[in-house]
């Protein structure tokens, strides 16, 4: 029997003598995480030159729609925040406020050297040395600026991380 949601290995693990033997929570976690990972809606928080590469990722060449990734402008409609660029002390409060407005579960991708650890401006008095000091980060994308392929790979890594998550 072929199942659309479970792979053959998972189906073989859950199947025993024609019955589906599992804890109800395991199966619901699997289905929920499968659905969540296939419909990521990132919100852009472009702060510097990395935002240009983020826009490049949204273009037709990379076609994020085929992965279920659609950019949203509102934090209430998105579940992923992409922090792209240098985070200053003045923008840190706005970043946290926007993050708090997102619905749970919410994920953060830190894109570029500046968002990861301050980058070129690390020693400046007005730069936060990594957005992980303000919001919890799930995936770090290195580079200055990282390529569109690197951001796409980071999104795919986030999808895999969501699939492996246990909800309860």
Curated annotation (Swiss-Prot):
Keywords: 4Fe-4S, Cell inner membrane, Cell membrane, Iron, Iron-sulfur, Membrane, Metal-binding, NAD, Quinone, Translocase, Transport, Ubiquinone. It is a peripheral membrane protein. GO terms for cellular component: plasma membrane; respiratory chain complex I. It holds the Pfam family Oxidored_q6. One of its GO terms (biological process) is electron transport coupled proton transport. Its EC number is 7.1.1.-. It is found in: Cell inner membrane. Its cofactor is [4Fe-4S] cluster. HAMAP family: NDH1_NuoB. This is NADH-quinone oxidoreductase subunit B. It comes from Wolbachia sp. subsp. Drosophila simulans (strain wRi). The gene is nuoB.
């Amino acid at each position: 029997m072929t199942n659309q949601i479970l792979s053959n290995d998972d189906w073989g693990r859950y199947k025993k003598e024609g019955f589906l033997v599992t804890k109800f929570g395991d199966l619901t976690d699997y289905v929920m995480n499968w659905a969540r990972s296939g419909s990521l809606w990132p919100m852009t928080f472009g702060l510097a030159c990395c935002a240009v590469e983020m826009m490049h990722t949204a273009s037709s060449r990379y076609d994020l729609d085929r992965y279920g990734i659609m950019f949203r402008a509102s934090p209430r409609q998105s579940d992923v925040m992409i922090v792209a660029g240098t985070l200053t002390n003045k923008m840190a409060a706005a970043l946290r406020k926007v993050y708090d407005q997102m619905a749970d579960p919410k994920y953060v991708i830190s894109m570029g050297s500046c968002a990861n650890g301050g980058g070129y401006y690390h020693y400046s008095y007005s730069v936060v040395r990594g957005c992980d000091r303000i919001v919890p980060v799930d995936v770090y994308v290195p580079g200055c600026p990282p390529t569109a392929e690197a951001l796409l790979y980071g999104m795919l890594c986030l999808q895999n991380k969501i699939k492996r998550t246990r909800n309860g």
